[in-house]
Design a protein with these regions (language model features):
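Specific aromatic-rich, kink-prone transmembrane helix
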Residues: 289, 339-365, 390, 537
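Aromatic- and kink-enriched transmembrane "portal" helix at the membrane-lumen/periplasm boundary
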Residues: 256-263, 272-276, 283-289, 312-349, ...
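Transmembrane-helix motifs of polytopic, lipid-linked glycan transferases
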Residues: 88-99, 273, 277-302
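Signature aromatic-anchored transmembrane alpha helix within multi-pass, membrane-resident enzymes
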Residues: 111-119, 194-201, 310-313, 425-429, ...
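Transmembrane-helix signature of polytopic, membrane-embedded enzymes
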Residues: 108, 116, 285-326, 344-345, ...
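Membrane-lumen/periplasm interface segments of specific transmembrane helices
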Residues: 31-44, 210, 220, 416-502, ...
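Hydrophobic/aromatic-rich transmembrane helices and adjacent perimembrane loops
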Residues: 140-157, 287, 378, 507-557, ...
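Start-transfer (signal-anchor) and selected internal transmembrane alpha helices
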Residues: 1-31, 79-119, 135, 141-207, ...
Length: 722
């Protein structure tokens, strides 16, 4: 950044600087308008920002236009007027705020804010020229990548713009505090966690409310969500660790039982609402180990022990704003409870204990994390390698005690460190083999684990999959070296301004799992649950990369600014930039990625995730209350997926869908012992709209009684005649 970033007072701002600033603001508005027009003129580009319905309204397509029309016209003049007005208002208001905060003249603040801030607006249109150039040069991969990621480019420019404003507005009193010694360290450290508690509390309230509204509105599926609550109910009532989606115990699906630790709470409040509250709380509390690890890494630099608190708090807030983490709370398909989510705070706590070098805490953390899912063992292999080769490269902190030190007695020498790390790696491989090749097949009566079909291109069993990868490396590298892989990485790293890349050894711990996820044919983006283990590794790498990011920014400032600028000014400014860049990058990428209230889809009327469609009053939810009393709790009920959650406390709750189920004799339809059949006709995935379309009632009318409709056709209730 230019030297003007550091000037605190100037009474002789030259007219040339003011004119130059105005020109940059005007140029930024024009170039940004050009880029926005390009994005909005194409349906395929615009839907990275808005819903197809909103795009059709923006370009004013006629009602009868074909739904697959990809081009539309957006007035460049209209965009210039809007962005020009935004530019003028934010330029003038921002300069006023900067002047008040810094104690500088308004003209100086106006010139500096315009020159530096609107450089980011000019960068918006660089995307367009790069995209055009890639097309002309035949770089189809680059062109394709740019076409699916303009939202990340815009988010980066917005984050840079906000970071510039907040850095320029750093008050004189703040700079004075930064220049002091660390005598205020303890009082500041005591205050900072209060803000962290507040941020976590806001997250818990918001996401618990959203999850509960989905439940009340019958928009939460049973499969891969409420089925986990059924596990707890069945265990509590002596039916075994199972869901009646299929016969057999759940260990045939995954070695996953972390949610059983909720049984004491569940016994007091047996409701799925409790599970949603616990999951949101657990995810939010993951911000604390992020804070602790980041602060520890930064505090090792004696130049800024105090500022480590602020940077660590920014990292923790970025974690709460991080879209891939939020998708573990509410997935893109509205699956809201996944035990995998508990692995994020558990693994973060384990890594925190590892950094503190607490042997007992680390071992307990590793053991509990393995209860989340067998996938976490994939991380422990490379983590063992990291311990073996890099684990002792970081100095012991002052809080490390000789009695509890991870390295004391266990890793005092290179050989012992190497053996401990390799032992963890060998254990992880053995555990993964035992889980997938022995335990799970045994609970499946010898059948192959179900997720081998996610890698159907490579084979039908783990042995075939590995064999194909070794014998056909071209197929493997073709799948890995793709636009989808790069986009996946961008979606994980861009929200953190790519700072985790500055800690490559830590980030490499997640590389094998990331490669596996890129081969997954079911989902190749961080909007489901598969990426959960990577979230913890990425924030661990963020903690390790932040000190290097601060140093990198400091060197850039020293190179770009006047030699007379004091080094301590470079230090404080670089820390301020990194502090704001972390959370603004997470916030701005979330505008286009997350479906929370901070995301555009939440407010886009044409979006499937608009707040009124998902969380507002629901006619389906109101009418369902009329039929629930008709079905006794001791009955066996088959139901469609989105009403199934309301029957998990009945004697049996069966899935009614097009899938073949073992409980139904490996055929579609209901099991023979079913007493009631409940069908939801008005969910957007519903295929049956009337009783005449129900195969059981249509083919065997003498066996079923159609109960009177009291729901205006929203639900069909059939009772088996006995």
């Amino acid at each position: 950044m230019p030297a003007t970033l550091h000037r605190t007072r100037s009474t002789n701002t030259s007219p040339t600087r003011l004119v130059s600033s105005a020109v940059v603001v005007l140029l930024g508005a024009l170039l940004a308008s050009s880029g926005v027009q390009t994005w909005l003129s194409s349906r395929s580009l615009a839907t990275n920002f808005v819903s197809p319905t909103a795009w059709r309204q923006l370009v004013r397509l006629p009602v009868g236009a074909m739904p697959n029309v990809d081009q539309g016209e957006v007035s460049f003049g209209s965009i210039v007027l809007v962005l020009g007005a935004v530019s003028i208002v934010t330029w003038l208001a921002g300069a006023y705020w900067i002047a008040r905060r810094r104690g500088s003249s308004y003209s100086e603040s106006l010139a500096t804010w315009g020159l530096v801030g609107w450089g980011w607006w000019c960068l918006i249109d660089v995307w367009e020229w790069t995209w055009i150039g890639a097309g002309l040069l035949g770089a189809t991969s680059l062109s394709g990548l740019l076409a699916v990621s303009p939202q990340l480019w815009l988010a980066g420019c917005l984050a840079g713009w906000l970071t510039t404003l907040l850095t320029l507005a750093r008050s004189g009193s703040s700079r004075a505090v930064l220049a002091k010694d660390s005598s205020l360290d303890e009082s500041q450290a005591a205050r900072t966690p209060r803000w962290l508690w507040l941020a976590c509390g806001v997250y818990i309230v918001v996401f618990t409310t959203l999850n509960w509204r989905l439940y009340f509105n019958l928009l939460m599926p049973h499969g891969d969500s409420v089925m986990y609550e059924e596990h707890l109910w069945n265990v509590l009532h002596g039916k075994g660790f199972r869901s009646y989606l299929d016969q057999g115990l759940f260990f045939g699906e995954h070695i996953q039982f972390v949610h059983l630790f909720l049984l004491p709470l569940y016994a007091c409040w047996p409701s799925h609402l409790l599970l949603e509250l616990c999951e949101s709380t657990a995810l939010a509390l993951g911000a604390f180990p992020v804070y602790w690890m980041t602060r520890r890494c930064l505090s090792r630099d004696s130049r800024f022990p105090l500022q480590a608190d602020t940077l660590a708090l920014a990292a923790a807030v970025a974690y709460l704003l991080y879209a891939p983490m939020q998708f573990l709370d509410i997935e893109i398909d509205l699956k809201t409870f996944r035990p995998e989510a508990f692995g994020i705070p558990l693994l973060l706590l384990t890594l925190d204990q590892l950094e503190r070098r607490h042997l007992v805490g680390t071992l307990i953390g590793l053991a509990i994390t393995l209860t989340v899912k067998e996938d976490y063992a994939i991380l422990f292999g490379p983590l063992g390698v990291w311990i073996a080769w890099s684990g002792s490269s970081e100095p012991v902190t002052a809080t490390t005690s000789a009695r509890s030190s991870f390295l004391a007695g266990l890793l005092p020498r290179d050989l012992n460190r190497f053996l401990a790390g390799m032992a963890l790696s060998v254990f992880s491989v053995a555990y993964l083999w035992l889980a997938t090749r022995v335990v799970m097949p045994w609970f499946r009566s010898g059948a192959e684990v179900h997720y081998t079909r996610y890698f159907a291109k490579f084979g039908e069993s783990p042995e075939q999959i590995v064999g194909t990868m070794l014998s056909n490396p071209g197929l493997l590298f073709g799948e890995l070296c793709s636009t989808a892989t790069v986009l996946y990485a961008l979606l994980l790293l861009a929200p953190l301004a790519f700072i985790p890349l500055l800690s490559p050894a830590r980030l490499a711990v997640g590389l094998p799992l990331f490669g596996i996820l890129c081969l997954n044919e079911l989902a190749k983006d961080p909007r489901h649950q598969f990426h959960a283990p990577l979230v913890a590794v990425i924030f661990w790498a963020l903690a390790g990369g932040l000190p290097r990011a601060v140093e990198l920014v400091r060197k850039l400032l020293a190179r770009w600014t006047a030699a007379s600028t004091a080094n301590d000014e470079h230090d404080s400014t670089s820390r301020t930039i990194c502090t704001h860049l972390i959370w603004t990058a997470s916030l701005c990428t979330g505008l286009f990625l997350t479906i929370s209230p901070l995301g555009c889809p939440f407010w886009d009327v044409g979006s499937n995730w608009h707040w009124q469609k998902l969380y507002g009053p629901s006619r389906r939810g109101e009418l369902f209350a009329r039929i629930l009393p008709l079905i006794p709790r001791d009955s066996r009920v088959a139901s469609t997926d989105f009403v199934h959650p309301r029957f998990t406390h009945h004697e049996r709750s069966y899935d009614y869908s097009g899938y073949r189920r073992k409980v139904a004799g490996d055929r579609t339809g209901v099991p023979d012992d079913t007493d009631f059949l409940v069908i939801d006709t008005n969910h957007r995935y519903s295929e049956i709209k009337s009783a005449a379309e129900v195969p059981e009632y249509r083919d065997h009318p003498a066996d079923w009684e159609l109960l009177p409709d009291e729901t205006d056709g929203y639900f069909i209730v059939l009772k088996r005649r006995r």
